[in-house]
């Protein structure tokens, strides 16, 4: 099968923002008809949208927040497992101020909750925030995007925390390496060692 890819994104979303009740035909439930080989789930734990609010419209906190993210993550895993799809749950790098994602421990628990090898947890910390510490910039190779004179920015300037070109590249490479190590993707299909990135 082939697909037409439309670039659509929203800022600050939670997992529940991507269900059909909130996104209509863009909901994750519609992926089932494609029977994807793999789901990669990566949410840092945002809780500012209406689907993450309590009955009074206030953002969920504490146990209610954790319970909601746990239930929503379970739902995504169940959607994937209906078609025998694999699921890689990705913990985001540590944020500015050394804040950890709100989903890391939930994601870490999923392979135990769903034994059988179709559900895996992966942390991007070693690639972007070694030792659990926020890193703004790092030494780099000329073949990596965003590398200027042997150094590149991993994250946006303060106060933002999103990934710059070098950070996004290392994030993606770390995930691909994990997929290859799991045997879920053929290494030859993703080999970019002979390509110089812009």
Where are the model-predicted features located?
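Conserved SGNH/GDSL esterase-like catalytic core that processes O-acyl groups on lipids
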Residues: 1-63
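Extracytoplasmic/secreted proteins, especially bacterial periplasmic and envelope-associated proteins
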Residues: 26, 34, 38, 64, ...
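Second-shell loop/turn segments in exported
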Residues: 15-16, 59-67, 77, 91-98, ...
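Active-site segments of SGNH/GDSL-like serine hydrolases
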Residues: 42-48, 76-107
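Catalytic His-Asp segment of secreted/periplasmic serine-dependent ester chemistry enzymes
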Residues: 94-198
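Structural recognition of the beta-strand scaffold that forms the well-ordered cores
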Residues: 5-9, 37-43, 85-91, 120-123, ...
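Short, well-ordered coil/turn elements that cap or connect secondary structure elements
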Residues: 1-2, 82, 113-116
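Residue-level preference for short coil/turn positions at secondary-structure junctions
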Residues: 34-35, 83, 156
